[in-house]
């Protein structure tokens, strides 16, 4: 049987696999903010990126290893294909972390071998121990993944896994790369590996799931029963295509149904010991931070973290909840940190009070960013009576989003009405501080603003998404705007919040433009879509 740490290990890949969501690219400061919050959440492993993909990814992994990795903190992990160049870059990036891991992988399904790698089973079986051993020579902790394991021949899979463990892999990860399996099939796959790999007792069995059929978390729960003990998830379930297994759903399923799952860990069913090390009260905070920084809006009916997750519309349900919340709620909202805090801050409040609350919300701002956030807070306090945590999060996320901005919005002014043609005037500042003004007309005020900004920026793009939602309730609520731009097949998102949605739209568009300028031309390398280096030879 596979190694059993006695509980479930949570491997968070929000910063690697989650960032592969279209338009969800993060800059270094954003990745660092999320990594710091993941550490507060209590995940066991943070997969911080794919160091070989670009200098930006390498720097982000290295910075997270320096500032988030610690003797008592999470393991900092980097992803690497089964090639020496990838593995060496990964080792260098995670080197500053006291607890570090290299996660290397190669595909094992026949469809991947034939059409992507163009390699035989024998060649893959030779590559695996060589590359795992090389990784093991650089770090003490190596994880090996069989990409597309769910569609691989089980007998070949057993051979590959046995070779990887013999070469030094301490964790074996089984990905359902395309979200193909059903829970019973996935459970049987994990049980088969646990039973038929002779040296499986020397490694922890891990799983990685995609949600193409909406079964990722269900598959994981079945894998728990079959011996898997590490689970690779993302916050809010973000990821390419239909996303990944949602961390918050898995953790809370194990929390709420602990009596059911305890026996699979050799415990009494009524054992109160948690099955994960996750601090559940940090879940909502983490979800909102990731949503704010990626621009990926959480659907209202999303389990655990959706805005409707604890809402009751039916009169019968409302009556039951008022009498006893357990009639229609299986989770106390406070367990996941969901509160409707209204902070007692106003025009006379000081910077220290605002800074303290922001730190509680997971934001560690520089002095300059705090100054800007505090100025925006004071401005909002003049226009809005009650300031909530959601308001603060909306205010400060822009400071984290844009540490270096080529364009800065100085002014936006619009005129529109039932008998007027929508017209916008904008002033945009360049990096050198030079200000330029442009005016444009459009089908509406937002269209006019975007046309004027494009005229000044001179950066070709296509606006493919514009959405606005209320941050909080009330007529004075801030409106949060998300904009996505496309250029050369790449998506760039920006968001902003303001009590004036036109101003929010203008700033969101500028934020997206800044991401576009920073992101275009950056090396793009998708670890799950790119084969092992074509010219790679054994030993090179």
UniProtKB/Swiss-Prot annotation:
Assembly description: Homodimer.
Family per record: Belongs to the alpha-IPM synthase/homocitrate synthase family. LeuA type 1 subfamily.
Any one GO molecular-function label of the UniProt entry: manganese ion binding
Primary site of residence: cytoplasm
Cofactor: Mn(2+)
Task performed by this protein: Catalyzes the condensation of the acetyl group of acetyl-CoA with 3-methyl-2-oxobutanoate (2-ketoisovalerate) to form 3-carboxy-3-hydroxy-4-methylpentanoate (2-isopropylmalate).
EC main group: transferase
Gene: leuA
Record GO cellular component, one term: cytoplasm
Recorded catalytic activity of this chain's protein: 3-methyl-2-oxobutanoate + acetyl-CoA + H2O = (2S)-2-isopropylmalate + CoA + H(+)
NCBIfam families attached to this UniProt entry: leuA_bact (TIGR00973), PRK00915.1-3 (NF002086)
Residues reported to bind Mn(2+): 17, 208, 210, 244
Annotated segments matching region Regulatory domain: 408-540
Documented EC number(s): 2.3.3.13
Source species: Prochlorococcus marinus (strain MIT 9303)
Sorted UniProt keywords: Amino-acid biosynthesis, Branched-chain amino acid biosynthesis, Cytoplasm, Leucine biosynthesis, Manganese, Metal-binding, Transferase
Localization annotation: Cytoplasm
Gene3D superfamilies according to UniProt: 1.10.238.260, 3.30.160.270, Aldolase class I (3.20.20.70)
SMART domains (alphabetical): LeuA_dimer
InterPro entries, sorted: 2-IPM_HCS-like, 2-isopropylmalate_synth_dimer, AIPM/Hcit_synth_CS, Aldolase_TIM, LeuA/HCS_post-cat, LeuA_allosteric_dom_sf, LeuA_bact_synth, PYR_CT
PROSITE patterns associated with the record: AIPM_HOMOCIT_SYNTH_1, AIPM_HOMOCIT_SYNTH_2, PYR_CT
GO biological process: L-leucine biosynthetic process
Pfam families noted in UniProt: HCS_D2 (PF22617), HMGL-like (PF00682), LeuA_dimer (PF08502)
Designated name of the protein: 2-isopropylmalate synthase
Known pathway: Amino-acid biosynthesis; L-leucine biosynthesis; L-leucine from 3-methyl-2-oxobutanoate: step 1/4
The Pyruvate carboxyltransferase domain, residue ranges: 8-271
């Amino acid at each position: 049987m596979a190694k059993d740490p006695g509980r479930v290990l949570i491997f968070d890949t929000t910063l690697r696999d989650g960032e592969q969501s279209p338009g969800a690219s993060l800059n270094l400061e954003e990745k660092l903010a999320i990594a710091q919050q993941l550490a507060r959440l209590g995940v066991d492993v943070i997969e911080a990126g794919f160091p070989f993909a670009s200098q930006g990814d390498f720097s982000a992994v290295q910075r997270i290893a320096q500032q988030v990795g610690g003797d008592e903190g999470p393991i900092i992990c980097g992803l690497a294909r089964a090639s020496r160049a990838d593995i060496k870059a990964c080792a260098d990036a995670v080197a500053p972390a006291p607890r570090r891991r290299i996660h290397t992988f190669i595909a094992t399904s026949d469809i991947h071998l034939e059409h992507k790698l163009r390699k035989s089973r024998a060649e893959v079986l030779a590559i695996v121990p060589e590359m795992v051993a090389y990784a093991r020579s650089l770090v003490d902790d190596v994880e090996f993944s069989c990409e597309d394991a769910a569609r691989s021949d089980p007998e070949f899979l057993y051979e590959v896994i046995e070779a990887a463990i013999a070469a030094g892999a301490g964790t074996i990860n089984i990905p359902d790369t395309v979200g193909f399996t059903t829970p019973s099939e996935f459970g049987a796959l994990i049980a088969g590996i646990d039973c038929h790999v002779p040296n499986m007792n020397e490694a922890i069995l891990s799983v990685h799931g995609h949600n193409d059929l909406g079964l990722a978390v269900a598959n994981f729960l079945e894998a728990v029963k079959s011996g898997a003990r590490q689970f690779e998830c993302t916050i809010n379930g973000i990821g390419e295509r239909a996303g990944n297994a949602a961390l918050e759903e898995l953790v809370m399923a194990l929390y709420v149904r602990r009596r059911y799952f305890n026996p699979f860990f050799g415990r009494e069913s009524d054992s109160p010991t948690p099955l994960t090390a996750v601090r559940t009260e940090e879940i909502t905070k983490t979800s909102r931070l990731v949503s704010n920084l990626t621009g990926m809006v959480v659907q209202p009916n999303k389990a655990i973290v959706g805005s409707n997750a604890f809402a009751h519309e039916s009169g019968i349900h409302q009556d039951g909840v008022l009498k006893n919340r357990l009639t229609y709620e299986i989770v106390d909202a406070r367990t996941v940190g969901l509160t409707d805090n209204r902070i007692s801050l106003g025009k006379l409040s000081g910077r220290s009070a605002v800074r303290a609350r922001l730190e509680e919300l997971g934001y560690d701002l520089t002095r300059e960013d705090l100054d800007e956030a505090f100025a925006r807070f004071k401005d909002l306090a003049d226009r809005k009576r009650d300031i909530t945590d959601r308001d603060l999060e909306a205010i400060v996320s822009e400071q984290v989003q844009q540490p270096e901005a080529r364009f800065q919005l100085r002014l936006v002014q619009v005129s529109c009405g039932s008998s007027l043609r929508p017209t916008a005037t904008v002033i945009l500042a360049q990096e050198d501080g030079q200000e330029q003004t442009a005016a444009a007309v459009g089908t509406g005020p937002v269209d006019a603003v975007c046309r004027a900004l494009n005229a000044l920026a001179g950066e070709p793009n296509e606006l493919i998404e514009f959405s606005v939602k209320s941050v909080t309730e009330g007529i004075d609520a801030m409106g949060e705007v998300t904009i996505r731009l496309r250029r050369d097949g790449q998506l760039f998102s920006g968001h902003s919040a303001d009590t004036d949605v036109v101003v929010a739209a203008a700033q969101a568009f500028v934020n997206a433009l800044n991401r576009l300028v920073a992101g275009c031309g950056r090396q793009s390398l998708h670890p799950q879509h790119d084969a092992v280096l074509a010219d790679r030879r054994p030993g090179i």
